[in-house]
């Protein structure tokens, strides 16, 4: 319980910082540090530990297999709603907070051995989906045009993705570098969680029936489907548990921010991100408990 209490404490610290005279762009600065320093260091340390087998492949495939399922559910859920509501859910529901929230929670619930699988799910799954699919949704509903060259440029200039390629090609880092990478990697959890807490905003005035259905899909239905797929594939236990937990992460803050900036149902988008994080602190330990009993 102590590690989980620490996670909640860091989130609350971020929330409390909202009430101080902290710089307006504090969350942006913290995110920048995580993306350019903490996460690349973690990737260089952890990814070489992955053995590419069917279990690792299953972890990578799950977010891509869940994507069309989620899109189909959203299309049905929003058939009587305006296009901006559909666009918001198409952005916010498929994309989970699989790094900033996912890494510390999975580390707490499953241990350090699960982190390589988290990084595989996050970088080859969530990040690529955000870059390719997320950009396409924004373009389709905001401008009507998809800029393929810009999408690819963002993809290959993203530091964590570049370090993922380096780690897979290079393998284990030189021993003299490891202590320094460990120091930088250790900043990921506290900085990321404080940033999430500082960014947490909850708005009223939402369509509660739709909000409830969307939250159930994100936090309950997706993990259940992921479990069914991975179980059928015969995925080894740690990889299965990691991918199921990652599939049940709350909506990505970046996806919510993009939806809000584009004017896609801002109140609904913010509520799914904000309340989703709070409720996931309950649902994820329950999912982990059930997985341990299977």
Give the residues covered by each predicted segment:
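Alpha-helical transmembrane segments of multi-pass small-molecule/ion transporters
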Residues: 1-294
């Amino acid at each position: 319980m102590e590690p989980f209490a620490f996670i909640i404490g860091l989130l609350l610290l971020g929330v409390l910082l909202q009430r101080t005279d902290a710089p307006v762009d504090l969350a942006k600065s913290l995110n920048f540090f995580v993306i350019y320093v903490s996460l690349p260091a973690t990737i260089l340390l952890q990814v070489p530990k992955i053995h590419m087998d069917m279990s690792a492949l299953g972890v990578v495939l799950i977010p891509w297999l869940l994507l069309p399922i989620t899109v189909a559910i959203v299309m049905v859920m929003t058939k009587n709603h305006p296009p901006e509501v559909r666009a918001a859910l198409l952005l916010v529901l498929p994309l989970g907070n699989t790094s900033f929230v996912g890494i510390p929670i999975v580390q707490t619930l499953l241990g350090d051995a699960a982190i390589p699988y988290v990084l595989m799910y996050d970088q080859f799954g969530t990040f690529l989906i955000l870059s390719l699919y997320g950009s396409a949704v924004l373009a389709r509903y905001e401008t009507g045009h998809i800029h393929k060259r810009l999408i690819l440029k963002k993809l290959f200039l993203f530091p964590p993705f570049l370090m993922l390629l380096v780690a897979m090609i290079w393998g284990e880092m030189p021993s003299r570098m490891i202590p320094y990478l460990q120091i930088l990697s250790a900043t990921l959890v506290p900085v990321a969680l404080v940033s999430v807490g500082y960014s947490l905003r909850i708005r009223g005035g939402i369509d509660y029936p739709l909000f409830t259905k969307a939250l159930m899909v994100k936090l309950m239905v997706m993990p259940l489907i992921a479990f069914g797929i991975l179980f059928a594939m015969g995925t080894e236990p740690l990889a299965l548990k990691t991918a199921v937990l990652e599939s049940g992460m709350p909506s990505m803050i970046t996806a919510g921010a993009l939806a809000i900036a584009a004017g896609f149902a801002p109140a609904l988008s913010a509520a799914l991100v904000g309340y989703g994080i709070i409720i996931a602190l309950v649902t994820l330990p329950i999912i982990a408990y059930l997985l341990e009993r299977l």
